[in-house]
Amino acid sequence: MDAVYASSQFAHGLIPACAGVGLRFRHHQEVVEEQPAAAWFEVHTENYMSGGSAPAYLDAIRRDYPISLHGVGLSLGSAEGIDVRHLERVRDVMKRVEPGLVSEHLSWSISGGIYLADLLPLPMTEEALGIVCTRVDQAQTCLQQRISLENPSTYLRFRHSTIPEWEFLAEVAQRTGCGILCDVNNIYVSASNHGWNALAYLDALPAKSVTEVHLAGHSIRQLDQGRTIRIDDHGSRVAPPVWDLFEQALKRFGPVPTLIEWDTDVPALGVLMEEAAIAEAAIERQRNDNLCTNAP
């Protein structure tokens, strides 16, 4: 399956194995005028499907930076089928932007023709696995490009789930040839909430399928009886234990494109660049370690 999409995978600009930044509306003008030293930017596909100033800004920014598209609306886990019109709109954005990478979420968000503004978890079953694989195949065929699936952050589990999430994701990649977007913060959040072993999760993912890593902040909410839950809210700096897990991910997967995400209480662009610099330093350390390991 990989070979089918190889010719279009990096149509405009290769996404480098460096730290990039999630591009948000409040930073458009600054990026155009100041041209910060960012390696690449990622945008949410759905934010650039209509008119207004956003697509025009992106057209200008893509002339100077590689762009990755990250979608939230394909609902690849929905049992009622893929929204063909939405898929076509994704394709239209791709034709205009020529992204280096295209990604979506392992989740669902459509039921009864109604779009639910959230990324909802799937039961990890053979039936759900078949549905997701079918949807991913449909998407890749329509888009004529390999897409990557992001592991979710979750706060509950289904009693009838029979497949560990990491095995589910790896199997989708195996069957469809899609990539895996390894969200390290999501792994840490879900592992903390469910009592999973985060390192074992990383080790279960096929390294050759990992095309990108995401890093973001999360919050901790107090529940009753002294319990806590971690919420993937993308509203703060990356937490120290997530940085530690990122170091382990680099050892497992090697240097890969790594994104700093920040979606709530979005700060000045300089703050995101500071976080990207920390990620870049970790990537460079791993790159140097690889050189030492491979030296004669």
Predicted ranges, named:
Residues 1-92:
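N-terminal pre-domain/capping segments
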Residues 28-29, 44-54, 75-85, 155-163, ...:
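Acidic-and-aromatic substrate-binding clefts and catalytic sites of carbohydrate-active enzymes
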Residues 30-36, 52-69, 85-100, 140-142, ...:
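Acidic (Asp/Glu)-rich catalytic clusters
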Residues 41, 102, 183, 213, ...:
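Conserved, mostly hydrophobic/aromatic
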Residues 50, 81, 119-125, 129, ...:
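Gly/Pro-rich active-site loop or hairpin
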Residues 85-180:
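Active-site acidic/histidine proton-transfer and metal-coordination neighborhood
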Residues 257-263:
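Conserved active-site loop/cleft motifs that coordinate metal ions or position small ligands
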Residues 269-292:
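C-terminal helical cap(s) of enzyme catalytic domains, especially alpha/beta-barrels
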